[in-house]
Amino acid sequence: MMINTGLNNKYQFENFFENDGNDSAKKVARAVVEDLGFYNPLYIYGPSGSGKTHLLQAIGNKVLENNPEKRVKYISAEDLLENELEIQKVRSEEFDLLIVDDIQILGEKDILIQEKFLNLFNSQQYKNKQMVFSSDSEPDQLKSVHSHLIVRFKWGITASLTLLEKLQEGLQMNDQERLLTIFLRLQLGASLGKKQLAHE
């Protein structure tokens, strides 16, 4: 039976934008691909736009490229934690690689859902099945997440990503453009004001 991996083939290591803030995370991600279960779990955190989803998907795509027989699943935390049945379904699949994006959403779920996810984590770990998570903050900064889960997120290796330089440059350029627009409007307003006074 075909598995819905949830992966998008456009996300690859080869087209992942690198800067000084994410080179280490990419190296760790590649190491996970080469030795599934050794760095377990891999926990990647960083702000929106830093490339977390791209890197997570690249891991899954590379694993399947190297080992097509592997059972790989990429899923957003929002979808995984929607209800108990979804968590149980994923647990029963026994994926060789389980990738969960935006795990900070755990903090928005009740204790029952968090406990079900804890059972899923323990099952994967016991069977030495690789897990990869992404979040907007490091494990100790997760809000309203059970302490047992926070401890487990730190069992393997944690890597951080920073905002991509190209995006930062774009944001800075947008700020400059906005300031220039305001300045030109002020200049135009002042010029029109002078003309109006001259005609009066």
Regions found by a protein language model. Give the residues of each.
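P-loop NTPase Walker A phosphate-binding motif
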Residues: T53-E69
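Walker A/P-loop nucleotide-binding motif
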Residues: F38-L56
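Dynamic helix-loop-helix/coil hinge segments at AAA+ ATPase domain boundaries and subdomain interfaces
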Residues: N4-S24
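Short regulatory helix/loop adjacent to the ATP-binding pocket of P-loop NTPases
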Residues: P139-W155
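AAA+/P-loop NTPase substrate/partner-engagement loops
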Residues: E65-L97, L106
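Conserved P-loop NTPase "ATPase switch" module shared by AAA+ and STAND
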Residues: R91-Q114, L120, Q130-S135
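Conserved AAA+ ATPase "SRH/arginine-finger" region at the nucleotide-binding site
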Residues: G156-Q168
